[in-house]
Amino acid sequence: MNIDLGLFISFFGIFFFYSLILYFAAPRKTITLKEIYISILAGIASISVLQFTYAFLPNQVTYNEFNEFMYVVAPREELSKFIMFLLVTTWISKKRKIKPVGYMIISCAVALGFALEENMHYYLKYGEHVLSVRNVSAMPAHMFFGGIIGYWYAVGKLNIGKFGGRINLGQWFVKSRLTIYSTIGLFCASLMHGIWNYSLSFYSKMINAIMDSIPKVMALPVFNNGWLPITLFAVFILLFLMRILYRDLIRLEKEKQDYIKE
């Protein structure tokens, strides 16, 4: 039995690397590897939820590329991941209490599973060459969008003392605070996801056109795809923003513990 080692590493190696980052970057006793991989499996299963939404909620938006990305693709994908995120957190919560950062990590892991399944779809459709681009673009991007949802859900769980008033809506709608915060997270993730998809589609076409006019300079394989410069820059920005949200949850958890001690 012949195994294409390069394809195997390209498909699973980077995915495994990202999953280990989620685990080793987490504070102690926040998450286990088992919980991360169960979350990833849930993310893979979220593709089925996505297909369900297309089957029972047909697209009524007038088609153009912007509307397709902003009002159809992004919201449905984020909703599908969020549903599986809720199932995973419900399961884990029955065994132990989840720390705020844990919600963000679980949501990122679910998104990573979704991206892995999506990679399989694009590989079967376009071939192996798409994996090298998607491994450094779609995977971290999906994790970032999932991180946004996990962040807002976690903030909704911080409902003690001054943390109940993180935003004014939390003060006015105490009983529905978690629902409101989750909705904010879904909206922000969907908005960022839609902008990401549309921007990459637009600018990669523009850059590819420029590259075609400079064949000798851009003949190297590394420059053969207009996604490369855009995605690397965009991913850097997304990871920087995720770090800010991540550290904010750690700070809030510490302040919450100090508040309880007082």
What spans do the regions from the language model cover?
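Hydrophobic alpha-helical segments at protein termini of multi-pass membrane proteins
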Residues: 1-262
